[in-house]
Amino acid sequence: MAINYPAGTRRRTAQAKNTMRTGKTTKKALTFGKRGMGLEDEINLANDYYLANHLAVIHKKPTPITIVKVDYPARSAAKITEAYFKQASTTDYNGVYQGRYIDFDAKETKNKTSFPLKNFHEHQIVHLANVLSQNGVGFVIIKFTSLDESYIYPAQALIRQWEKLRGKQSIAYQDIIAEGYRVPESLNPSLDYLKAVDQYFENLN
């Protein structure tokens, strides 16, 4: 079947095994475990870990597909032979953690000093605002790939920056540090982002 896939990385189903040691080799082992993995790969592996250990139920939302051509090799069967992915209308992930509905997107940048707002679409901002209006928890996981740092950035802060900058320019790295929550380094899962969500929850209570 000919499917036109959007730019991105494939989901990995296995994670590299590491032998942890103390001292300077610890960080090297953590880095090796994430080598070649994109942000979505790390989130998907973390979600699998959370589900298997009964910590949370969080899934990646399916991307809407537009079907272009269908063949019917048999009266009782239909085969999609050509389709393409449409632009996602909301965010990447949603689920339940500690009795709360959470909804979030995942973004990466190579920039070291700021995060471009052009990486978001207005409908995503509107969606996160709607989540907040229903007492849900919304945020974005932002990864600075050049710094190997990831942050939970609250939807409230993102919406405020979007309105202030009118969806243009960038959010300063220092602003993300000030209002966000650093995801700590971890071995399994490699991106234990719920640790940062826990800190976020503490400030919400």
Curated annotation (Swiss-Prot):
Q: Which reaction does it catalyse?
A: Endonucleolytic cleavage at a junction such as a reciprocal single-stranded crossover between two homologous DNA duplexes (Holliday junction)
GO terms for cellular component: cytoplasm
Q: Which Pfam families match?
A: RecU
The residues that the entry says bind Mg(2+) are T90, D92, D105, Q124
Region feature Disordered, mapped onto this chain: 1-22
Q: Where in the cell?
A: Cytoplasm
- Keywords, A to Z? Cytoplasm, DNA damage, DNA recombination, DNA repair, Endonuclease, Hydrolase, Magnesium, Metal-binding, Nuclease
Indicate the annotated site residue(s) for Transition state stabilizer: K107
The protein's Enzyme Commission number: 3.1.21.10
Q: How is the cofactor bound?
A: Binds 1 Mg(2+) ion per subunit.
> What cofactor requirement does the entry state?
Mg(2+)
- Biological-process GO terms, alphabetical: chromosome segregation; DNA recombination; DNA repair
Gene Ontology molecular function terms on file: endonuclease activity; magnesium ion binding; nucleic acid binding
- Identify the Gene3D superfamilies for this entry: 3.40.1350.10
Q: What class of enzyme is it?
A: hydrolase
Q: Which NCBIfam families match?
A: PRK02234.1-5 (NF002584), recU (TIGR00648)
| Family indicated by similarity | Belongs to the RecU family.
Q: What does this protein do?
A: Endonuclease that resolves Holliday junction intermediates in genetic recombination. Cleaves mobile four-strand junctions by introducing symmetrical nicks in paired strands. Promotes annealing of linear ssDNA with homologous dsDNA. Required for DNA repair, homologous recombination and chromosome segregation.
In its UniProt entry, what is this protein called?
A: Holliday junction resolvase RecU
Identify the gene encoding this protein: recU
